[in-house]
C-alpha cells in the first residue's frame, strides 16, 4: 500500500515540478539568469550579488546543476545546426533536473538516515507528501541544493561514525566535497552540520587517516572552488592573479550578512520568527504533532539522541540569531524533522496534513506569481503578432523597439525572453515593482508616443527611450487599471487594449485587508486572478482598434 501511495506522490511532485509558479526571485536571479546569459547569450540582468566589488555568490556549486544542462542543450543545438535552444525548453529541462535530484538524492538520503524499515516507510511518505518537497525542492533555489547537501552530509557522517573498523577514507573525501560545496552555496550550511561534524572530530584520534582525508581533500576542493569563482568574476585573470587576489565568495557573504545595516535592506524580523512563524508555515500539522509528542519525556530524550532532529533544531536556533529570517532558510529542516515524526493512525492528523499540503501546494506550486514565467515566455510572440503590420512597413532590417512595463509582479527574469534575433525585435523590460498607480501612469505617459508623433512607427529611432510600442503586464486583480481599459473616449490620455492573459496567477502582494476588508480583498484577488498583457496607446490615434 505504501509503495502505491509513494508512486502517486511522486507523480504529484512531477506535476508541480513542471508547473511554472514563481515562489521567489532568487530562484531565477541567483542561478538561471546568470548561466543562461553567460552560456546562451540570452538577455540577462545580474543581481547585485554578482556585480558588486565583493561578490557574495559562488558559481562552484551551481554550475553542475544549471551550467551543465544548459551547456549540453547549447552543444546539441549547435551540432544540429539550429538556433539557440528556446528559453521554454531550457526552463523545463532545468526544472526536470531539480525534480530528479529531489526524487533520487533527497528520498535516497531519507531512506538511509532512518534505520528501522517501519519508520523508514512513514518517513518517505511524509517527506514525499510535503508541499515543500513538491514546490521549493523542485525549484531552482540555492536552499534546495542546500537541503540535498545537508541530507547527504548526515548520511556520510553516519557511515563514518558507524564504520569503526576502517578509516572511511572515501566517505571522508566525499564529505569534504559536500562541506566545501555547501559553504560556497550558502553560508548557513555549517549550522546544519556543526553538531554532527563534532562527532566525527571526536573520533579522529582513533582514525588519523580519516582526518587527513577530510582535511586534505577539503583543501583541494576549496582551492578548486576559489579558482572557479575567481575566473568567473575575472575572466582575464591569470593563475598568478588568482593567487594574488582570489575571490572568496563565502567570506564576502559572511562579512555582508554580519552587518545588520545590510540585513535591514532585506527586512528585519524578531528572533523568534523562525520557530513561531516559519516552521509552522513549512510543517503545519506535523509541527503540532511534534509539539504534542514533546510532552513525552522518552520522546524528548530520543530526539536529543537523534542526529537529524538535533541538526535541524540546533540549526534553527543558530539561524534565529540573525534578524533576517525567511521560511526558505529552513527548507533543509523539513525532511530531517519529518523523518523523525512518529505518526500514529489518526484521521484528524491525516485530514489536516492532506488539506494543509494540498492548499499550499496549489498556492505556491501553481498560482503564486504563476503567470510571470508563462507571460515572459510569450512576450516576444505577443509583440511580434501585435506589431506585424508595423513591421511590414519597415524598410531594411531595422529592429522594432518595444518597451514592456511590468507592474505589481515579481521581477520578470529577462533570460526567459530567449534569442529574438529572428523576430527582429529589441525588447526593453521596465520593472516598476509595487510603485503607486500614479507613478505607473506617469511612466506610460512618458513612453507612449503622442498622436503628433504617430509617424514614429515607420521612422524608427535607435533610442529605447522612445519605443515603437509600449506594453503593460500586470495582475488582472488590480482595479486601478480598469479606468484605462479599452474602449476609451478620444479625450482620454491612455488606453489599454488587452492582448493576452494567463489565468493561473495570484499575487499575494496585492492583498490590502486594511483598506478593502478581508472578504472583498479575497474576492478580488481570487475572483479576478490572472496576469494580463495590454497594449498601451492613445485613444485619439489607435494603432489597433478594440
Curated annotation (Swiss-Prot):
A single MF term (Gene Ontology): alpha-1,2-mannosyltransferase activity
Entry keywords, A to Z: Endoplasmic reticulum, Glycoprotein, Glycosyltransferase, GPI-anchor biosynthesis, Membrane, Transferase, Transmembrane, Transmembrane helix
Pfam families linked to this entry: Glyco_transf_22
GO biological process annotation, one example: GPI anchor biosynthetic process
Recorded metabolic or biological pathway in which this protein acts: Glycolipid biosynthesis; glycosylphosphatidylinositol-anchor biosynthesis
UniProt-listed InterPro entries: GPI_mannosylTrfase
Positions annotated as glycosylated: 420
EC number: 2.4.1.-
Bilayer topology: Multi-pass membrane protein
Ranges in coiled-coil conformation: none
Spans traversing the lipid bilayer: 5-25, 58-78, 96-116, 141-161, 174-194, 208-228, 348-368
Any one cellular-component term (Gene Ontology): endoplasmic reticulum membrane
Signal peptide (from-to): none
Annotated localization: Endoplasmic reticulum membrane
Purpose of the protein: Alpha-1,2-mannosyltransferase involved in glycosylphosphatidylinositol-anchor biosynthesis. Transfers a fourth mannose to trimannosyl-GPIs during GPI precursor assembly. The presence of a fourth mannose in GPI is essential in fungi.
Family: Belongs to the glycosyltransferase 22 family. PIGZ subfamily.
Protein name from the UniProt record: GPI mannosyltransferase 4
Amino acid at each position: 500500500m505504501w509503495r502505491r501511495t509513494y508512486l502517486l506522490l511522486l507523480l504529484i511532485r512531477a506535476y508541480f515540478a513542471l508547473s511554472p509558479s514563481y515562489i521567489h526571485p532568487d530562484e531565477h536571479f541567483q542561478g538561471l539568469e546568470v548561466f543562461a546569459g553567460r552560456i546562451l547569450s540570452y538577455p540577462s540582468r545580474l543581481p547585485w550579488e554578482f556585480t558588486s566589488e565583493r561578490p557574495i555568490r559562488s558559481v562552484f556549486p551551481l554550475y553542475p546543476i544549471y551550467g551543465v544542462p544548459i551547456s549540453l542543450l547549447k552543444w546539441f543545438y549547435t551540432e544540429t545546426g539550429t538556433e539557440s535552444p528556446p528559453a521554454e525548453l531550457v526552463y523545463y529541462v532545468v526544472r526536470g533536473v531539480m525534480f530528479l535530484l529531489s526524487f533520487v538524492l533527497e528520498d535516497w538520503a531519507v531512506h538511509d538516515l532512518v534505520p528501522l524499515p517501519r519508520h523508514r516507510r512513514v518517513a518517505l511518505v511524509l517527506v514525499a507528501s510535503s508541499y515543500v518537497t513538491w514546490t521549493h525542492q523542485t525549484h531552482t533555489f540555492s536552499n534546495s541544493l542546500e537541503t540535498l547537501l545537508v541530507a547527504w552530509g548526515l548520511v556520510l557522517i553516519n557511515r563514518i561514525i558507524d564504520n569503526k573498523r576502517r578509516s572511511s577514507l572515501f566517505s571522508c573525501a566525499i564529505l569534504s566535497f559536500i562541506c566545501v560545496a555547501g559553504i560556497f552555496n550558502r553560508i548557513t550550511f555549517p549550522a546544519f552540520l556543526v553538531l554532527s561534524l563534532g562527532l566525527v572530530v571526536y573520533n579522529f584520534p582513533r582514525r588519523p587517516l580519516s582526518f587527513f582525508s577530510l582535511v586534505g581533500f577539503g583543501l583541494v576542493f576549496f582551492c578548486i572552488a576559489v579558482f572557479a569563482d575567481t575566473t568567473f568574476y575575472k575572466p582575464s585573470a591569470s593563475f598568478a592573479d588568482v593567487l594574488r587576489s582570489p575571490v572568496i565568495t563565502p567570506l564576502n557573504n559572511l562579512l555582508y550578512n554580519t552587518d545588520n545595516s545590510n540585513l535591514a535592506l532585506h527586512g528585519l524580523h524578531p528572533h523568534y520568527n523562525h520557530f513561531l512563524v516559519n516552521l509552522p508555515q513549512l510543517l503545519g500539522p506535523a509541527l503540532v504533532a511534534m509539539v504534542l509528542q514533546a510532552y513525552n519525556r522518552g520522546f524528548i530524550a530520543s530526539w536529543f539522541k537523534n542526529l537529524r532532529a538535533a541538526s535541524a533544531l540546533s540549526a534553527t536556533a543558530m539561524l534565529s540569531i540573525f534578524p533576517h529570517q525567511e521560511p526558505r532558510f529552513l527548507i533543509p529542516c523539513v525532511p530531517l524533522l519529518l523523518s523523525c515524526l512518529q505518526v500514529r493512525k489518526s484521521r484528524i492528523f491525516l485530514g489536516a496534513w492532506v488539506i494543509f499540503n494540498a492548499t499550499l501546494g496549489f498556492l505556491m506550486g501553481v498560482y503564486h506569481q504563476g503567470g510571470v514565467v508563462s507571460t515572459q515566455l510569450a512576450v516576444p510572440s505577443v509583440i511580434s503578432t501585435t506589431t506585424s503590420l508595423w513591421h511590414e512597413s519597415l524598410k531594411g532590417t531595422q529592429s522594432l523597439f518595444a518597451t514592456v512595463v511590468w507592474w505589481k509582479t515579481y521581477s520578470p527574469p529577462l533570460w526567459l525572453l530567449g534569442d529574438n534575433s529572428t523576430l527582429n525585435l529589441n525588447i526593453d523590460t521596465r520593472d516598476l515593482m509595487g510603485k503607486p498607480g500614479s507613478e505607473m501612469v506617469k511612466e506610460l505617459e512618458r513612453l507612449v508616443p503622442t498622436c503628433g508623433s504617430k509617424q514614429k512607427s515607420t521612422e524608427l529611432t535607435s533610442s529605447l527611450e522612445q519605443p515603437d510600442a509600449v506594453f503593460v503586464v500586470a495582475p488582472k486583480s488590480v482595479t486601478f487599471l480598469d479606468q484605462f481599459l479599452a474602449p476609451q473616449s478620444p479625450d482620454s490620455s491612455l488606453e489599454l487594449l488587452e492582448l493576452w492573459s494567463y489565468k493561473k496567477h495570484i499575487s499575494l502582494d496585492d492583498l490590502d485587508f486594511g483598506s478593502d476588508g478581508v472578504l472583498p480583498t479575497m474576492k478580488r484577488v481570487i475572483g479576478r486572478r490572472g496576469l494580463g498583457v495590454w497594449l498601451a496607446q492613445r485613444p485619439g490615434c489607435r494603432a489597433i482598434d478594440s
